[in-house]
Amino acid sequence: MLERRKPLDLLFPLKGSATTREDGEERQSMTALDHVRAGVMLARDAVKAVSVTAMEALREGATFIGIVGEKNELVDPFEHLDAPIWSDRPPQELTKLAFRYCEELTMREAGNFYHSFKYLPDEQRNAMCAVYAFCRRADDIADGDWADRFPGSQGEMDPEAVAYREQLESLQDQGTILDEEAYLNKITQLFFFRKKLSTCYSEVYSTDPVFLALKETVDRYSIGREVFDDLISGMEDDLYNNRYRSFDELYVYCYRVASVVGLMCIEIYGYEDPRAKKFAESWGIFMQLTNVLRDVGEDIQRDRVYLPLDELEANGITEPELGEQVVLNKQWEPYCRDYARRARTYLAEARQLLPLLPRRTRYSPAAMIAFYDKILRQIEKQQGDVFTKRVKLNKVQKISLAAAVYMRHRLLPAFLDPLWTGLARIGLLPAV
């Protein structure tokens, strides 16, 4: 009979986990049936489902359930349910409530992104908000203090959560950059976050509004699970790495936390040309490279350096200089120019995505690309000064960019698009 701790060890191997020779031999001898048993033990609480009576009561009260609390805080409308799933499809009223929750979360946490969703058809806007809410929650777990509800549990004291935590505590040499308590908390929550993701690809429905809305989204737009798993893996990277030796290492990180989001988005936008996937990957790389440069000053205060270390060394730039802001010297500005030049190679590919998308959905990615292009230009204009103040767009810049994007990608007849491109090259129109 399997030990209580073994299922988590089998189904969720950890980086750098300490194993004995006997453990290795035992794992190699595990049969398919043993793996099934392990899975059953791990997910046993997930068989609990909200009763039909409770579901009907929720359906009747859905129009009265609020998602904003007395102190204007965002409230999970299903937080008092003591079961993790609905075994049957919940009423449409509850799914609509879940989408409302995701939309409110997006408006609160990412006004610029929400603006870019503004002109999408309702179904696609809802889907984009569900995807954003998933990404936001994963990031909040890895990089913030979000306390997620564990499925089939009463939180941290759930037997399976306790068993998993004990298993983690028994492992040695994790190589995490966090203190032990923070690491155990975050890796446990990300594990259960993956469990919730599983409901989106099964016959049950999560009582977490984010995953209820996400399930409807992945079903409607046939989005594969791999991109969501990759994003969670990117969040896990932040628990182990706070330095990247080379651009190749940084690229993998950027792909996991940003490119996969672009790949999710294009399934919602719609496309036929397979090149759209390559350009969506470049779109994510461009945006994340811009984020990395913009946030250098803030990241170094959190003991994180995302810029490739080999490139900093080659340019005579040291970490202490980044932290003390004395890096604003003759080495830093040329490095920033080279960095921006490489980011723009991905920007050029990202822009090739736009003509491959339907006109009705093109504004959304075009606006995001234009905003980040402007941020990168502003960094260059400030000679790479990302230390003394955060680089961001003011309201006038946002409005003017949004108007230009709207005009080009929603109003301008297609046959005039080359004319806009030509005038943008000589500076008579914005390059959006």
Predicted regions and their residues:
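Catalytic cores of Mg2+-dependent Asp-rich isoprenoid enzymes
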Residues: 2-288, 293, 297-432
